[in-house]
């Protein structure tokens, strides 16, 4: 009988949920959903000095924002330390592990000798078959795996293919430190086994770990999960991903105004492909995703592509949802609280009314907020330098005339104000653009905005007449 698929996302809480980790979580989540299985979440907090509660909170928050839910309770690796030690005791009893009393000086000498001789395996087996009665008094030993000295360790990787290591290049790795704390290599194997993990999907920087962990599985007589080591994400120039390239936490992308659906869509295409399709709904991702379609080459992060994709999602988003997302993002941006204080039932309704025009140009929620500034701005309206250049004495006189014409409009709407302005332009022998631009500058403080008649309708009669009066001169 085929076991149900169980994947896991297992971050270390030593910092934020970075973009590479987010993609790993997404791939695990998609594969579990595709196969009708579960994705578990394990926090690998065995490094007590570097693990922080703030980092744990950031990881959980990032996954929730990306809408990558996990199944069951969060597993904390450190809490399983007693179980890890229990397994080591079993291995000692079975003779697949041994106590090592080598001193720091002896280990340093072994490393130097291995380096001089060009060997990757540095530990010389000093305590591998030595009589325990030779143990020096008062020394707390480590416990090492009695790894095979000959032959090969092989991983049939779903992404990388068949990967082979010569056993004479692999050390007797430490399972338990001198203070009794389990090492990462041991803890991962025991936890994956106990959690029933069937598929391990992680970055290919863990590939060498797979060889070492396979030897632990073999020593315990446990079946190794299916392994898939996905390529890392590089910068646009092929170099290691840096903050300049996008190596930021998921929280930073939220604060930059990206939508979770857009970021998921972008991340799924970093290293995985499905023909020429670029836009995927969540349902389409789940339907199409599979491990063999992940490439072996490092994916390149491209901010411009992400921005364009985010713009697509903004343009196709429901207007009410965008207003909600716009309000939500304010808590994560500088001066967001000041903007939030200006949003009330009236301005919220204006934002909703203006959204069809606002979202056409915006690539991020921050651009959307910037475009909506004219709705929330206090009088007198701040005028951008480029717009200020439009406000010549003649233009200010024209604005006074336009205001007088608009004052006659009683039933205020985009259609009625447009009719009034077209009539004014025709009467004065002007093109509509010569009328629209002074209006735009006076009403928004900018030279670009949504359609000017939509702006008139959104702001309402009294606010428009007041703003025009602020910029008019006789």
UniProtKB/Swiss-Prot annotation:
Protein name as catalogued: Glutamate--tRNA ligase
Compartments, record wording: Cytoplasm
Function: Catalyzes the attachment of glutamate to tRNA(Glu) in a two-step reaction: glutamate is first activated by ATP to form Glu-AMP and then transferred to the acceptor end of tRNA(Glu).
Gene Ontology MF: a single term: ATP binding
EC number(s) given by UniProt: 6.1.1.17
Gene Ontology cellular component list: cytosol
UniProt KW keywords: Aminoacyl-tRNA synthetase, ATP-binding, Cytoplasm, Ligase, Nucleotide-binding, Protein biosynthesis
Catalytic activity of the protein: tRNA(Glu) + L-glutamate + ATP = L-glutamyl-tRNA(Glu) + AMP + diphosphate
Family membership: Belongs to the class-I aminoacyl-tRNA synthetase family. Glutamate--tRNA ligase type 1 subfamily.
Principal place of residence: cytoplasm
Pfam family, one: tRNA-synt_1c
Residues spanned by motif 'KMSKS' region: 240-244
UniProt: ATP binding residues: 243
Organism per entry: Rhodopseudomonas palustris (strain BisB18)
Quaternary structure and interacting proteins, as annotated: Monomer.
PANTHER family: GLUTAMATE--TRNA LIGASE, GLUTAMATE--TRNA LIGASE, MITOCHONDRIAL-RELATED
Gene Ontology biological process terms in this record: glutamyl-tRNA aminoacylation
Renumbered ranges of motif 'HIGH' region: 11-21
């Amino acid at each position: 009988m085929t076991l149900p698929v169980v994947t896991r996302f297992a971050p270390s809480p030593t910092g934020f949920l970075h973009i590479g980790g987010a993609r790993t979580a997404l791939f695990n989540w998609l594969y579990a959903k595709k196969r009708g299985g579960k994705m578990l979440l394990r926090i690998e907090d065995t490094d007590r000095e570097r693990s922080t509660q703030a980092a744990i909170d950031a990881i959980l928050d990032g996954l929730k924002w990306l809408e990558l839910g996990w199944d069951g309770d969060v597993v904390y690796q450190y809490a399983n330390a007693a179980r890890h030690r229990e397994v080591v005791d079993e291995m000692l009893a079975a003779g697949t592990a041994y106590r090592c009393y080598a001193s720091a000086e002896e280990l340093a000498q072994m490393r130097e000798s291995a380096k001089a001789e060009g060997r990757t395996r540095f530990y010389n087996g000093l305590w591998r078959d030595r009589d325990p009665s030779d143990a020096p008094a008062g020394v707390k030993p480590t416990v090492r795996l009695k790894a095979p000295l000959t032959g090969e360790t092989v991983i049939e990787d779903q992404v990388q293919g068949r990967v082979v290591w010569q056993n004479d290049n692999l050390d007797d790795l430490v399972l338990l430190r001198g203070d009794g704390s389990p090492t990462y290599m041991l803890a991962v194997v025991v936890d994956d086994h106990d959690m029933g993990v069937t598929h391990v999907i992680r970055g290919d920087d863990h590939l060498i770990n797979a060889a070492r962990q396979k030897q632990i599985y073999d020593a315990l007589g446990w079946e190794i999960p299916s392994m898939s080591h996905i390529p890392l994400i590089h910068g646009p120039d092929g170099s290691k991903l840096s903050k300049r390239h996008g190596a930021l936490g998921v929280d930073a992308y939220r604060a930059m105004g990206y939508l979770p659906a857009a970021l998921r869509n972008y991340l799924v295409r970093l290293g995985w492909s499905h023909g020429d399709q670029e836009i995927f709904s969540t349902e389409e991702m789940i339907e199409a995703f599979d491990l063999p379609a992940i490439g072996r080459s490092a994916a390149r992060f491209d901010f411009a592509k992400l921005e364009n994709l985010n713009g697509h999602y903004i343009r196709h988003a429901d207007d009410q949802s965008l207003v909600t997302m716009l309000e939500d993002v304010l808590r994560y941006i500088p001066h967001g609280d000041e903007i939030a204080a200006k949003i009330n039932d009236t301005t919220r309704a204006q934002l909703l009314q203006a959204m069809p025009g606002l979202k056409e140009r915006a690539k991020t929620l921050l651009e959307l907020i910037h475009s909506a500034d004219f709705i929330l701005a206090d009088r007198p309206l701040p005028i951008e330098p480029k717009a200020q250049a439009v406000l010549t004495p003649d233009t200010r006189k024209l604005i006074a005339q336009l205001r007088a014409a608009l004052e006659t409009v009683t039933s205020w709407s985009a259609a009625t104000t447009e009719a009034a302005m077209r009539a004014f332009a025709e009467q004065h022998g002007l093109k509509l653009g010569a009328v629209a631009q002074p209006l735009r500058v006076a009403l928004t403080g900018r030279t670009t905005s949504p359609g000017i008649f939509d702006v008139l309708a959104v702001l309402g009669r009294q606010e428009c007449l007041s703003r025009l009066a602020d910029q008019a001169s006789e």
